[in-house]
A protein has these predicted regions:
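Hydrophobic, aromatic-enriched alpha-helical segments typical of multi-pass transmembrane helices
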Residues: 1-244
Length: 244
């Protein structure tokens, strides 16, 4: 039992660190780089920004890939922690988070395509510069749609994980309950937004996932520095042995 507790404690710290690391990475990549280079409604200016700061643009892509890798580590750590509570639900959450991670791979490929369109390669000379800029902007804009498709699955994954955290008592139940509510809110808002794009005029897009983001930051700090509630784990394991 001691070995099991030590293993869960280690994976909890991995999950906590990865929560915080992935959050910081995605903020740097998107708010610090991509949003800085992307000019809304202006394909020509966006193209000039990218080509003038190609290295920075590539760093943003690298950050996206690091974020994607972090998501894989996170889903594995959470699966190990939550599997003793309910293996099927833990697997479902891991699958949904994997789908979300794959959408980031698609977004990275779109960014590489945009960069290739602006590269000035010889085989692109048959196209007008404005057309290439518009196509590059189109591929970059597609990332917006891909993100919200992925966010639906991420919200579902977080909802399931939060429920299992609530059921397990690994973290304070009030925090886990907030996670369930904020994650379900994110998934619901995203689903409605996909069907009704004007929904963003009623609820700002930032409010879709901001509450869930707050939950993940707090949970990350809790798991990294506070760890799991080990007495509850020991009690559950003892009860399991008595039933056998």
């Amino acid at each position: 039992m001691e070995e099991k507790i030590t293993s869960l404690k280690t994976y909890a710290k991995v999950a906590g660190f990865t929560y915080l690391f992935t959050f910081a990475t995605v903020i740097i990549a998107n708010l610090g780089i991509h949003d800085h280079l992307n000019v809304a409604g202006n394909a020509a200016e966006t193209a000039r920004n990218i080509m003038a700061n190609e290295r920075l643009f590539r760093i943003g892509i690298a950050c996206d890939l690091i974020y994607c890798a972090g998501l894989i580590v996170l889903l594995m750590a959470l699966y190990v922690i939550l599997k003793p509570i309910n293996r099927n639900l833990a697997l479902l959450a891991a699958f949904c988070r994997l789908v979300y991670a794959l959408t980031w791979v698609v977004m990275v490929l779109n960014l590489f395509t945009a960069l290739r369109l602006l590269s000035g390669a010889d085989y692109l000379q048959v196209f007008e510069a404005q057309r290439l800029q518009a196509l590059a902007k189109l591929y970059m804009g597609t990332d917006f749609d891909v993100y919200y498709v992925g966010l639906l699955f991420y919200g579902l994954a977080s909802t399931v994980c939060s429920y299992l955290l609530f059921k397990s008592g690994y973290i304070p139940r009030a925090l886990a309950a907030f996670g369930v509510i904020s994650s379900a809110w994110c998934a619901a808002c995203t689903f409605v937004f996909i069907i009704f794009p004007d929904f963003s005029k009623v609820i700002n897009l930032w409010w879709f996932d901001t509450p869930m983001g707050i939950f993940e930051i707090v949970t990350g700090f809790w798991l990294l520095f506070g760890g799991l509630r080990l007495p509850l784990i020991a009690k559950r394991d003892k009860a399991s042995h008595q039933e056998q």
